[in-house]
Amino acid sequence: MNTRAKAPEETTVVVGMSGGVDSSVTAYLLKQQGYNVIGIFMKNWDDTDENGFCTATEDYEDVIAVANQIGIPYYAVNFEKEYWDKVFTYFLDEYKLGRTPNPDVMCNKEIKFKAFLDHAMRLGADFVATGHYARAVYEDGEHKLLRGVDTNKDQTYFLNQLSQDQIAKAMFPIGHMEKSEVRKIAEEANLATAKKKDSTGICFIGERNFKQFLSQYLPAQPGEMRTLDGKTMGRHDGLMYYTMGQRHGLGIGGDGEPWFVVGKNLQDNILFVEQGFHNELLYSEGLYASDISWTATMPAGTEFRCTAKFRYRQTDTPVTVRVLDGGRLDVAFDERQRAITPGQAVVFYDGDVCLGGATIDDAYKAGQALTYLA
């Protein structure tokens, strides 16, 4: 059922406002279009830094400034407990398994389009809106998630876990725009955030050193760094600090090509490294994935063709997907891929339509798993 039939003046939209330019323009455009707009600032993390400065305070002040400029009510809502339980705990659990998680995917699924969506519905909202570069449309009896028009900013990779019900209640007013156009609108409207820099990185780490941050929550277990033929190359600081294909921070000197992480032995706490960017051990023919979520109807049959991304801003890769027993997928690549990373998302597309995604368990070549080596 298409839920977008009411006139704007009869429709209440709650906008997730972060204090950035994208969500500011989102609220501004909806107000200009005649919607009843409410701005909500989500406080998901106690992000006071070592000097006692809380970046959320500055961000909320920017939300207040923009909300007052465009004439909408605003509130702050605390989702710290939900974020800890659903996102941060998952983040730590994945690192314990030697994987590299993507908390942004989980945050969208569990916080922005669940806890926040539920809160908005209790306020009487018809929709929630965010400043994501994506599009939500109703076609052929389904609510579909489409890529943002700005291919460099498209964020469907991070929205791959959204369900039909979540997409049905979502609005992405800047999804049909280029980033430069969004900035221009903000500047012409003289919004307080018009010249504010985009935030980058994981929200709860911010500008802090990643190793120092993670070590506050997980005890590091240093161990041996070896080649696959058993030559010791040094010591690692803890397997959780390293990801497939990583080059920097290994501390291996000498002549010749750089060294890269090619695998882990979790049981014996060994990090495997080999030399050369194009080392064969970094390339795989496919991957196994689990925790599958389809944004729309799952493609028919137990095998289908589509394209996929294995990291944000990657060019789409043609793949063949086979549905295995036990809720797993076998994703075979048309062309070999480098440094596939367990814990990250594999996201599937049919043209501009995001079909859904899953969590990468491991990569394989000639039927042999590559990452977790005994």
Curated annotation (Swiss-Prot):
Active-site residues, record numbering mapped to chain: C107 (nucleophile), C203 (cysteine persulfide intermediate)
InterPro entries, A to Z: MnmA-like, MnmA-like_C, MnmA-like_central, MnmA-like_central_sf, Rossmann-like_a/b/a_fold
Gene Ontology biological process terms in this record: tRNA wobble position uridine thiolation
Family indicated by similarity: Belongs to the MnmA/TRMU family.
Spans annotated as Interaction with tRNA: 153-155, 311-312
Organism field: Exiguobacterium sibiricum (strain DSM 17290 / CCUG 55495 / CIP 109462 / JCM 13490 / 255-15)
Pfam families for this protein: tRNA_Me_trans, tRNA_Me_trans_C, tRNA_Me_trans_M
Enzyme's top EC category: transferase
Catalysed reactions listed for this entry: S-sulfanyl-L-cysteinyl-[protein] + uridine(34) in tRNA + AH2 + ATP = 2-thiouridine(34) in tRNA + L-cysteinyl-[protein] + A + AMP + diphosphate + H(+)
Protein name: tRNA-specific 2-thiouridylase MnmA
Positions that bind ATP: G16, M17, S18, G19, G20, V21, D22, S23, M42, G131
